[in-house]
Amino acid sequence: MRNQQFAIRPTTLDQARVELQQIHFLDDTNLSFTTPSDLLRDFYDRSWPEYTTSSVVAQQLSNLMATPETDGLTYLTTHEQVPVDVFYNLALQRLGFAVDLDFQLTDPLAAMTKIQLPVADHEGTTFTLNELMNAWYVLLTTHNKTGQTFLDQLTTHGYFAPLIHDNSVPKPLIFNGKAQAVFDTTQLIHEVVYVESPQDTDHDGHRDLLKAEIIRPAETANGLKVPVLYTASPYNQGTNDEAGEALTHNVNVPLTAKQPAATTLADVTAESVTTPLPDARPVTATTHTAAETFAREQSYTLNDYFLARGFAVVYAAGIGTKDSDGLRTTGDPEETTSTIAIIEWLAGNRTAFTTRNATQAIPAWWSNHQVAMTGRSYLGTLATAAATTGVAGLKTVISEAAISNWYDYYRDGGLVVAPGGFPGEDADVLAEETFSRQLLAGDYHRIQEKWQHQLAAITQNQDRVTGNYNRFWDARNYLKNAKNIKADLLLVHGLNDWNVKPRNVNNLWRAVRDLPVTKKLILHQGQHIYINAFRSIDYTDIVNLWLTHELLGVDNHAETLLPNVIIQDNVTPETWQAYPDWDAPSNPVQHFNLQADELVAPSDHIPAAATSFNDQLPVDQFNHYTHHIDEWQADLLGDKHNAMFKHRLLFKSAVLTDDLVLDGRPTIDLQVAVNQPLGLLSFQLVDYGDAKRLGVSPTPLRIRLDEGYRWREDNLREFTVAATTPWKMITKGHRNLQNRTNAYQVDELKPNTFYDLSVTLQPTHYRLLAGHQLGLVIYATDFGMTVRGNQDLQYSIQLGQSALHVPFITD
């Protein structure tokens, strides 16, 4: 394994001593010790909280080897000094690394270097008392074999249990700039409130009430004010999976010609809708006691981790969900309004009630008015939407795999393009799936007619006929309001996420690059996933450092300690690199011209020529591919004379003599013609060369990774190397040939006439190894994403006028 820890805060010896005292590893007793071996023995005695007798603790120490010949108990009993190699022999074993398997007792420092574990500063071959204190401090921050810090490992064994009810222990308790698990998770308070939102989306003459589920530390009952992690999840109260499936659109339909129109941006700019708002409900009584509770929430494991560390957690599903008012809208300003209403209540700026009867108001009296939003996909999307309002109280957003513009989720370049894995899904399908008011028969009976009218409007306005950008999508483009962001941002995205494609995070990153907020970006090699339980990166520690700074006001240097950009390497397993930026404007660009079957240097002479392919497949082949998209993809990128040979164009570079690190948005300039007044092109950039590549889905390494003491659990995972493959798709893109100018203007397309076309592919960061070839595949129908009409469309490309441009960086 390889360990990368970005969140270890450099700490002076004086500060380390103070913090070790605060967590009870140092006290007046062991501070009086004069020999390093006695101090280390005492540290180890304290590190087995599950054993209460000294003889059993001694036995545990005797089970560790200090040298190839001597166990830990014997060594520390018979020696005064602690050699550096003895310290790390014992430490590696306590971290779960196996002698002879993971390291050799004759050279533990070699393993520390190989695994990339931190080694404490020391001047000689043995630790002084002060150096030993510092070394133990650093060890507590070091990751074990399962990706947890040693202190988190001790936490799961009950180290902090005696401190939970110790009034002398400060709460929150901070160690190495991070909050520690000194809160009683067996006594968490669960309560429900109904926040009154400034909207009436179901038009019943009353402001919408929104259900919020709150989990807060019991210590708040005694006056402690705590920060809040808020997850806005439209799935939280249940989903209508069968109804969504029934509404899913047929994608085996032909592409149709569009009427040319010189549509302008002003024509498609969404207009603010101002409708009279019902009066707020009168507040006649206020209480601090909730009237409703709940059992088990649909939790997010990262939130669970922080519940043990003194953060409150709030879940809300928003308008149009079970036990709330309103109608679903899929990402428009009304949904943003409902999202930030919860923040406004948590910040003390909005009213909530104890029940839906709205007779008693209840403030968030336990909140310190500092809120972070967390979540992946739709959840992270709403966090992004909330941030673009600049709402007071929202200090930071941790958004994973989030949409920044809904057009980029369901459309691309004037085409209906599905999120990967969900052909036929659209905004109306998602609205129906999340309209969980439908799960309550009585409530649905009262609202059904309004909902069906709303759903029909979404279906019409999303416009699957043209695929153009319009006012519907403009209202769902959060990038327009990125300038309003005041919250600091931690953005996380998968470079192989073809559900919420990388363009979403890239566009947001570029939009906030010059804003006066702290922003960080983590890009991993996965699909549409969470990364908070990965072994090779200290993501949970990063988030802890970040939230402790953002919500607790601790000056732990998170804003400068964490790199601007962290990117997982696609070649070497368990490797993450720090970068100053992603897709920087200053990146150099490598240019390739298109020649018959080749990508060549611009200096090469290219004779004028055209090459063609036909998109129409034999019926049996077409039908087979619609049910076996993986086989279509393999044939598309595979050997030259396979089943897709006449239905796509493939260009390969010469074999690379050096690694090429792609970084940013590849672009393609073409001259293209089609034999009908309609057409589309799709593109894939490909790494050709036999290699064992990382899988895009993580491998479970261990079940039940504890997040506290006798608390909830998560599954440890990691990207592992898969079997050898001959190619790997790097990135892709699509364009309607009638949207050559932009996504809203419809251009004329005359049959058999060549037109200039420039296409920007999805952004990437990818290391292409020496000995491999860069490939470009040009095709039309994308069986996983576009409509599939199987039409007789013949496409021609002018080779002498076509080129690929690839931004790159040098290591």
Curated annotation (Swiss-Prot):
Q: What's one GO MF term for it? A: serine-type peptidase activity
Per the record, the domain of life is Bacteria
Physiological role? Removes N-terminal dipeptides sequentially from polypeptides having unsubstituted N-termini provided that the penultimate residue is proline.
Its EC number is: 3.4.14.11
Q: What is this protein called?
A: Xaa-Pro dipeptidyl-peptidase
**Cross-referenced SMART domains, in alphabetical order?**
PepX_C, PepX_N
| Database matches in InterPro entries | AB_hydrolase_fold (IPR029058), Galactose-bd-like_sf (IPR008979), Pept_S15_Xpro (IPR008252), PepX_N_dom (IPR015251), PepX_N_dom_sf (IPR036313), Xaa-Pro-like_dom (IPR000383), Xaa-Pro_dipept_C (IPR013736)
Q: Which gene encodes it?
A: pepX
What the record says about family reads: Belongs to the peptidase S15 family.
